[in-house]
Regions:
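Serine-hydrolase catalytic core
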Residues: 68-74, 220-299, 313-324, 330, ...
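Hydrophobic membrane-insertion alpha-helices, especially the h-region
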Residues: 5-21
Length: 339
């Protein structure tokens, strides 16, 4: 018996070593450029439009500027940047982002993260953490060109990118996080960055692609319904590296966090509410400059979109009050406040 136990123990040790030394997905390190080629705002808008035309996008998924005053197109005291979540584009936050920008007289940049909105069934095949981060950095740079101060709004993985930016840019005036992706509900995604992660995912998914069949056609226009598993590996890599207590402590800006939670049976089923709440407590933001609000009527992970949310009014009102009372944004009336 002792000899058998020794043999079994040895076999398990060999298997464990084989697993630990197994292949991990490697990303090429080639940071994309984030600097803006132009400073003139009208030319900047044209440059964005021309770049988006070449990207191979589904209709109406382009990144764009929504001007506080489209007849003048000038810099405003405050601009807003919206960063959508994994696989989504600007409609994921519509109409909340537009209503907030209009209410406060802000130029608004609706960003499109790297490889989002593509027509290609291989969307995300070329996505890397460096490219994902660079697209967020570029969005912030555009926001700075549009306003003297910048408020960044992010949903889900866009919230993750918003926190990433906040950790590195203390000059950001404020943060709005809707259902931020700190960890996904399904713990299996954590295997994506472990040894044999890509191989395991291919076996589970029976291939290299994820297909989503639950979206109605109008929503599917603004969300990817088929994408390469490399996107999930990129997402989990970002979560592993940047959604940590040490990184959260670097965030000092005023912060609003909204999420769907009614009770244990009725809550966000996509990203972890528990992880969000833990992150909230670990922020470097002072208690009087941050606010968390559960929206039990939202009913869905995406709480700020007309496609999904059951409580758009509640989400808008709570966010508007925070921006007014905590960040001290001033609503406009009549003529728009511009620089």
């Amino acid at each position: 018996m002792k000899r058998i136990l020794v043999s079994v123990t040895g076999l398990l040790a060999v298997l464990a070593l084989g697993y630990a030394l197994g292949p991990r997905h490697q990303f090429a390190s080639a940071p994309a450029k984030t600097e803006l080629p132009v400073t003139d705002l009208a030319t900047l808008e044209q440059t964005i439009a021309e770049s988006e035309k070449r990207a191979g996008l589904k209709p109406d998924n382009e990144a764009r500027i929504v001007w506080a005053d489209s007849s003048r197109k000038v810099k405003t005291p405050v601009s807003m940047v919206y960063i959508p979540g994994f696989g989504a584009t600007w409609a994921e936050g519509d109409p909340i982002h537009k209503k907030l920008a209009k209410h406060f007289g802000c130029n608004l940049y609706l960003a499109r993260p790297e490889e989002h909105g593509l027509t290609s069934p291989d969307a995300f095949k070329g996505l890397t953490p460096d490219k994902y981060k660079a697209s967020a950095e570029r969005a912030l740079a555009i926001g700075k060109a549009l306003g003297d101060r910048v408020v960044v709004i992010g949903t889900s993985a866009g919230g993750m990118l918003t926190l990433y930016l906040a950790q590195r840019h203390p000059e950001i005036a404020g943060l709005v996080l809707y259902s931020p992706c700190i960890a996904v509900v399904n713990p299996a995604l954590k295997l994506a960055t472990k040894p044999w992660g890509a191989q395991i995912m291919k076996q589970v998914l029976n291939g290299e692609h994820v297909t989503v069949t639950t979206y109605k056609p109008d929503r599917a226009q603004y969300w990817l319904t088929r994408y390469h598993i490399n996107g999930l590996i990129t997402l989990q890599t970002m979560l592993d590296e940047y959604m940590t207590p040490d990184e959260f402590s670097k965030v000092k800006q005023p912060l609003f966090m909204g999420y769907y939670y009614k009770d244990e049976d009725h809550q966000d089923k996509v990203v972890s509410v528990a992880a969000m709440l833990a992150m909230y407590e670990q922020l470097g933001t002072s208690a009087d400059k941050k606010q968390k609000v559960a929206f039990p009527k939202a009913g869905e992970h995406v709480i700020a979109s007309h496609f999904t949310s059951g409580d758009l009014d509640g989400v808008y009102r709570a966010t508007e009050q925070f921006l007014t009372n905590t960040i001290r944004l001033v609503p406009v009336s009549g003529t728009l406040a511009v620089r």
